Amino acid sequence: MRLGSVISEALRNIGSGTAHAVVMFLAVLLAGTLLGGYEAASVIGLEREATTRITALADTTTIMGTAIDGSVCDRLAGIDDGPSMAGAMRIGDPLTPVSTPGKDITSYQITPGMIDLLAAADATGRTRPDASGIWVSSDVAHDFGLAVGGPFATDHGTATVAGVFDWPNDGRDTRFVYAILVPVSATDGTFTECWARQWPASDQTETLLYSTVVAADGQNPAGVMAVNKGFDSHYDAQAGYLNRMTRWTPLAALAVGLLLGIVSVRRRRLEYAGALHSGQTKGAQLLGIAIETLIWGGSASAAGAGLLVAYCVRMSQSDPMAVLVAALRTPAALFAGVMVAAMLSGLTIRESQLFRFFKHR
C-alpha cells in the first residue's frame, strides 16, 4: 500500500468520524491542559512565595552588638557567591524639623551599600541609589510633604532629599518605618550593624558577617539575626521545588496518555482485524494508526501547550520560561503515552482475531 494511499485513508477516517478524532482531541487537550496547568500553578505559587520573602527582606541578615567596619561590610557584596548587597548603619542624632519644633525624628547614618539595599527592596521599583542627600521613609515624606530633590529643613540645617523609601509593616525591623537616613562614608568610624542580603540563603553569610567585626566585646558579644523575623528561617526554596506535590504530574499524564492510546485502538479493533483480512499489510495499518494519532494527539498537545504558554507568561512574576519548562513536561508525556500505547495496541491486533472480535461485538 503506497504512502499516499495510507495518508489519504487516515484523513478520510478523521474527516468521516471513524477515528473519533474530535472526542480524542478533546480528551487529550483537557487532560494535558489540566495536569500541566496544575503543575504550572504549583510552581508559580512557590515562585510567589519566594518573591514575597525577598520583597519583605526575609533574605536579609544583620550582625549587631559590636563595632563594625563599614568598608568591610560594604565590600561583602563583591565576594564570589556571597551577598548581593551589604551595608552598615548606626544610630545618629535625633533631627527636629523646623516646621515641628517639638517633634524629633530618629536618624541613622548609613553607608552607600545600605542605600543600594534600600533601593533594591523598594516594591515600586522606582527608587534609585543616590548618596547625595538624606533618605526619608514614605511615612515621613507624607507627613512633611517631602519629595525627591526637595529641601528638608531641620535643626541641623537644610538637607536635600535624595530618596524616599517604602518600609511596610510586614514583620521586618520597624526602626526604619519613621526615620531619616543620612549617608556617610564607609570609612567614617565604626558602625553598630552590618546588613547582608543573599538569595538563596547560604550558611556562608553568617561567617562573612562576623568578618566585619572590628573588636568583639566580651560582655556584649556580636549576634546574627534576621531582619524580618516573621518568616521561617529554615526556608529552603530549592527543597520546596524538588519536593512539590505536582512533581509527579508528568507520570500521571503518561498514564492517562497510555490509557487514551489503548482506548483509541481497541474500540476499532474489529475494523483493524477486518482490514488485515482484506489484505492490508501490518506496516500500512500501523502507519495509518500513527498518522491518525499524530493528528488528533499532536494537535491537542500543541493546543494545550499554547494555553500553558499564555498562562505562564501572564501569571509568572519573575521567570515564565522556567515555569513553562516544568509545565510542558506534562503534555509532552501525555502525547508520548498516547503514541506509544496506540502503536503497541495496533501491534497486538491480528487477522486471526477477527471472528472472536466479531462474536463479542
Segments from the language model and where they lie:
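Membrane-proximal extracellular/periplasmic loop immediately following the first transmembrane helix
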Residues: 1, 43-112
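Basic-flanked hydrophobic alpha-helices used for secretion and membrane insertion
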Residues: 76-83, 90-233
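Transmembrane alpha-helical interface segments in multi-pass membrane proteins
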Residues: 274-342
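C-terminal membrane-exit region of the final transmembrane helix in multipass inner-membrane proteins
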Residues: 333-361
